């Protein structure tokens, strides 16, 4: 099966903030695939890799198109710079939509949290909940006024169900207060940096929200406290040893070595690339594993996590 079967042509581009742009694409030679809130596509990059971007359900978007929101990051490994260099008429290849962050079925209320560019799947969730007529509250947090993308669209979608928070003033997000004010039986959704996700998860569990009602998607891998260094990965099945460079992920190193690896998000939040650790000490940077699982060092997400030891022996 082709990895990037969709051919997308850039129809329009808009600057949502100085660092965030929205892109609207037409699908060349075929119909727009069906998708639901929380879904993403993977856009192929010129270097042979790809990057996931959440699909946007923007108000008044014409039928037959797909929209993305992209943050330009100074520390980007190529994806955001490439996406910000696109112009109307350019063509890219992309995967079919995949959804690892779906809305719950049924009419239970939803409490939505978004941080920074993590608003992209949350905006689509708000649009879907509004269309269903189901109750929700959206808390959108950023560093300072002027830095939050898609505010006019969110106001059109959410009306009074939208709360805006800035770290720089008295509107700063109080997660515990937001949870206390939530409707009974709410599902909790959060997308943003790892710190925000962990804070919402911890507060929700403390409040007694069942784990199966807490849903999240990471929009930035955890930042290492010191520069990364190379290490080795040994495959248990064959004994093959692969060196992972300081600027590579384990998945990238395995692919360079000619190995076929199953993965999706490359952010440490979907669990598809999880594998067992036979020996060595992982440097966990995901948001999937519990604290207890991380301490056990028996599992790791090889899309983002690295090694504290010189070699890892993996159950691959």
Give residue spans per PLM region.
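Short hydrophobic/aromatic patches at helix-to-coil boundaries
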Residues: 313-316
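C-terminal accessory/binding modules appended to enzymatic or scaffolding proteins
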Residues: 229-262
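FNR/FR-type flavoprotein reductase catalytic core
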Residues: 80-236, 243
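A short, compositionally biased
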Residues: 36-38, 224-231, 269-271
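Ferredoxin-reductase
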Residues: 2-91, 95, 105, 142-145
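Short peripheral tails and domain-boundary helices/loops at the edges of structured domains
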Residues: 61-74, 113-130, 303
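Local cysteine-cluster metal-coordination motifs and their immediate loop/turn environment
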Residues: 121, 255, 259-286, 294-309
